[in-house]
Swiss-Prot record:
Coiled coil: none annotated. It comes from Burkholderia vietnamiensis (strain G4 / LMG 22486) (Burkholderia cepacia (strain R1808)). This is 3-demethoxyubiquinol 3-hydroxylase. The gene is coq7. It is an enzyme of class 1 (oxidoreductase). Keywords: Cell membrane, Iron, Membrane, Metal-binding, Monooxygenase, Oxidoreductase, Ubiquinone biosynthesis.
Length: 208
């Protein structure tokens, strides 16, 4: 029923913003313990990067909620739901790591969430093929972003690196699922606009 779905998505949104996310998988752990403690500067930098990643997961929840709600076929809804469920793991993992680093989520999370929700609705109104294409492009850009973070994170921060690496693996899977479900490639201007918006978000969330 539509009402039940609305209540469920509202609950998920509240959990995304309040940090009470459920995880279906445990937090990834490094294969080897860190060889050294993080310096204060390394902790600050790692926290900034993980805050950016947490914001990305807040946005992912909003995007996929909106796209699932506006999807026209059961198969598209299932694709968005599966991705959202795994992204909720990412949300919980990054929140957990921020606490370990004695840091906090972005102060602007309600703004990020609202913006992503609006974008998800807009993508959904263009039809399932475009909406799934938007998901595929989002996941490609997130994959590249996470690869960049793996090169930026301090070598000693094996805990954050384990989380980010598993997130990257999941994003690749989500992007492939969206393409396999019928997602079309977005035009270059749309992809460039998405990259520009992402850059604004990441540069702001690192500090705020």
């Amino acid at each position: 029923m539509v009402l039940d779905e609305l209540i469920s998505e509202f609950d998920r949104g509240l959990r995304s913003l309040t940090g009470i996310s459920r995880m279906s998988r445990p937090v990834p752990v490094p294969a080897q313990p860190p060889a050294a403690e993080l310096t204060p500067a390394e902790r600050t930098h790692a926290a900034g990067l993980m805050r950016v990643n947490h914001v990305g997961e807040v946005c992912a929840q909003a995007l996929y909620q909106a796209q699932k709600f506006t999807a026209r076929t059961a198969s598209a809804k299932a694709t968005f739901e599966e991705a959202a469920r795994e992204e909720e793991d990412h949300l919980a993992w990054t929140a957990h790591r921020l606490k370990e680093l004695d840091s906090r989520p972005s102060l602007l999370n309600p703004l990020w969430y609202a913006g992503a929700l609006a974008i998800g609705v807009a993508a959904g109104t263009l039809g399932d093929k475009v909406s799934l294409g938007f998901m595929a492009e989002t996941e490609r850009q997130v994959e590249n972003h996470l690869e960049g973070h793996l090169s930026e994170l301090p070598a000693a921060d094996t805990a954050s690196r384990a989380i980010v690496d598993q997130m990257r693996i999941d994003e690749v899977k989500h992007g492939k699922a969206a393409t396999d479900a019928g997602g079309v490639e977005l035009p270059l201007p749309a992809r460039m606009l998405m990259r520009a918006a992402s850059k604004v978000m990441t540069s702001t969330a690192y500090y705020l």
